């Protein structure tokens, strides 16, 4: 919380983390995605992107604890919840050195070093901001464990994904489904579309106005709470505490 002083009072105001300067920087980076430009604009990155993102991560610790004590908001500069702006170009033809978005990943404490683990995710990009959660591209044993849980507990899956508080806020990701039924499941299974998922994620769109509003911490915390039933189901399927 920020504060202002009125005669005889100290008034707490919601903190504003990001400004439109975040999106201005990222748009310009997309047009000038090279090391000399980034080096010349390093302080803008620090001021508009990294410092406010780390401040948000630090302040998310308490509301995240209210959702689950098994996920972490880690504000470390290296190895924490904020993804590096530098791209990994080792296995791609796209050699541009920088990402043109900011990403925050609040992972399960049992799998903190794994980007393919259950997590909350916040994506900030000009014209494409969203909050997401779930499990992205899990290894085959994890994916199979989730499919087995969906088939064994269809009512719990429906409660987690198709009812409030989840369903008014989130939409399940479409992803790139399997072409055929996964091993062990019949072609006429009533939940075949869900069983064929490669990713078990959900997302909700955010406007830039919401991201730059003073109440964004509370706004995003409410979004995390709405997604809790979905993450709870995934964690139980993987024998992870929630």
Question: How would you name each of these model-derived features?
Answer:
Residues 45, 49, 53, 143-146, ...:
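Amphipathic alpha-helical coiled-coil segments
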Residues 70, 75-109, 113-115, 159-177:
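Soluble extramembrane domains of integral membrane proteins
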Residues 38, 126-127, 204-205:
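Residues forming anionic-ligand binding surfaces in small-molecule and nucleic-acid pockets
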Residues 86-151:
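Aromatic- and glycine-enriched beta-alpha-beta binding-site module
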Residues 24-25, 41-44, 107, 118, ...:
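Short, hydrophobic/aromatic alpha-helical segments in well-folded domains
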Residues 1-11:
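N-terminal amphipathic/basic-hydrophobic helices that include classical n-h-c signal peptides
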Residues 9, 14-28, 57, 61-64, ...:
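Long, solvent-exposed, polar/charged low-complexity segments
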Residues 27-85:
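Active-site acidic/histidine clusters and adjacent loop/turn architecture
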């Amino acid at each position: 919380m920020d504060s202002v002083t009125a005669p005889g009072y100290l008034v707490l105001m919601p903190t504003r983390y990001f400004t439109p300067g975040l999106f201005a920087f990222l748009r310009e980076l997309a047009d000038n995605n090279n090391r000399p430009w980034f080096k010349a604009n390093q302080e803008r990155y620090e001021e508009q992107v990294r410092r406010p993102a780390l401040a948000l991560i630090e302040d998310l610790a308490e509301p995240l604890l209210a959702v689950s004590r098994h996920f972490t908001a880690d504000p470390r500069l290296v190895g924490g919840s904020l993804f590096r702006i530098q791209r990994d170009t080792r296995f791609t033809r796209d050699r541009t050195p920088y990402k043109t978005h900011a990403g925050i990943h609040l992972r399960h404490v049992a799998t903190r070093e794994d980007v393919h683990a259950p997590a909350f995710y916040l994506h900030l990009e000009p014209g494409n901001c969203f909050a997401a959660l779930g499990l992205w591209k899990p290894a085959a044993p994890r994916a199979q464990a989730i499919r087995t849980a969906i088939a064994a507990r269809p009512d719990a899956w429906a409660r987690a994904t198709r009812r409030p508080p989840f369903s008014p806020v989130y939409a399940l990701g479409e992803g790139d489904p399997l072409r055929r039924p996964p091993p062990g499941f019949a072609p006429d299974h009533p939940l075949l579309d869900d069983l064929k998922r490669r990713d078990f994620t959900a997302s909700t769109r955010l406007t830039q106005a919401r991201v730059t509003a003073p109440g964004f911490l509370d706004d995003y915390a409410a979004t995390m709470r709405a997604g809790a039933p979905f993450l709870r189901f995934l964690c139980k399927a993987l024998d992870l505490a929630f």
